[in-house]
Amino acid sequence: MDLITERPRILIVDDEPANLKVMREVLGNQYRLSFAKSGDAALALVEKEPPKLILLDIMMPNMSGFEVCQLLKQNPATEHIPV
């Protein structure tokens, strides 16, 4: 696929399935979407294929959105990604 016409990828991180469904319905036609239900899963996805934007839930079990954001911003490879 031509990189100029390829839709940007957004990573959506939320532990609530209903929220993920809404985001898919709202953004799915304009963007390529990736989903993670935990902070650990989000960090693994970002490492594998960095998105253009991360939409991050704050209140999640095990690792809060604040902790995920802090780890992303401490890493030179991901510090530039808008959260």
Segments predicted by a language model, with ranges:
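His-Asp phosphorelay/catalytic-motif detector in bacterial-type signaling
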Residues: 7, 50-52, 76-82
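Acidic, metal-coordinating helix/loop segments flanking the phosphotransfer/catalytic sites
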Residues: 35-53
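Two-component/phosphorelay signaling modules centered on CheY-like receiver
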Residues: 17-35
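Conserved acidic carboxylate
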Residues: 14
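Receiver (REC) domain active-site loop signature in two-component systems and cognate sites
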Residues: 60
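Active-site residues of response regulator receiver
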Residues: 57
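Non-catalytic signal-transmission and effector/linker regions of two-component phosphorelay proteins
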Residues: 1-11, 48
